[in-house]
Amino acid sequence: MNSFGGRRRETAGPKGRRAHRPPQDQDRDVQLSKALSYALRHGALKLGLPMGADGFVPLDALLQLPQFRSFSAEDVQRVVDTNVKQRFALQPGDPSTGPLIRANQGHSLQVPELELEPLETPQALPLMLVHGTFRQHWPSILLKGLSCRGRTHIHLAPGLPGDPGVISGMRPNCEVAVFINGPLALADGIPFFRSTNGVILTPGNADGVLPPKYFKEALQLRPTRKPLSLAGNEEKEHQRDSKHSSRGRGMTQQ
């Protein structure tokens, strides 16, 4: 059933579906997907879109914006249906609003009634919680932890790209996977949620950070897979403490 005429749904289309479409159409779909991501995750207020507490905005209002005027409702429907990461959801709405669309997660805007399933016990958490990043960010993450970085949540996947059942949560070209000790973080009061497309979300601590104490292990994914040490943070702290201690002794001797 078409999402405009039935209950809300968010499904990924067949993986081979796009391969049979002309390259220029695929490029337009990528352009539309990126524009939707910005408007629905970050820019709705700036663009003047009326967003509900659940993150939905009227599709008709969206399509009136200059960057969307070359696209139709059918284009949006196709991008929603064929998006393998299930980033967006459509629902019929009512006669006053018409069809509604939202991003399933990834907001920097506050969306207080986004449909998230609380994961309140260790048993409710996936067996694997992993955050994907790039090698250039790893030293900072190892030292300071994972940060929301302007979004409302830190994104985690229930597995590595290509694992069965893993739809979204990390980019397929990530170079480093950071595995999280969810039960330990949960015991310390850090909440976790599951979005409608299976991404695990956490706001982190009061500072919006998931500290390194919750890292179980780290894995370099490319160019070859190999374990990464978690000792770097402890070594740096030890070196810093030793430097301060030596400096203090030198001042005392003077």
From Swiss-Prot:
Alphabetical list of Pfam families matching this protein: PTS_2-RNA
Record's compositionally biased regions (Basic and acidic residues): 233-244
Q: Which SUPFAM superfamilies match?
A: ADP-ribosylation
Gene Ontology biological process terms from the UniProt entry: tRNA splicing, via endonucleolytic cleavage and ligation
Region described as Disordered: 1-30, 225-254
Reply yes or no: does the keyword Transcription regulation apply.
no
Which residues carry the post-translational modification N-acetylmethionine, per the record?
1
Catalyzes what?
2'-phospho-[ligated tRNA] + NAD(+) = mature tRNA + ADP-alpha-D-ribose 1'',2''-cyclic phosphate + nicotinamide
What does the record give as EC number?
2.7.1.160
> What top-level branch of life does the organism fall under?
Eukaryota
Q: Which UniProt keywords apply?
A: Acetylation, NAD, Transferase, tRNA processing
Q: Which GO terms describe its molecular function?
A: tRNA 2'-phosphotransferase activity
Entry's InterPro entries? Ptrans_KptA/Tpt1 (IPR002745), RNA_2'-PTrans_C (IPR042081), RNA_2'-PTrans_N (IPR042080)
Q: Its function?
A: Catalyzes the last step of tRNA splicing, the transfer of the splice junction 2'-phosphate from ligated tRNA to NAD to produce ADP-ribose 1''-2'' cyclic phosphate.
Q: Which family does it belong to?
A: Belongs to the KptA/TPT1 family.
**Designated name of the protein:** tRNA 2'-phosphotransferase 1
List the source organism: Bos taurus (Bovine)
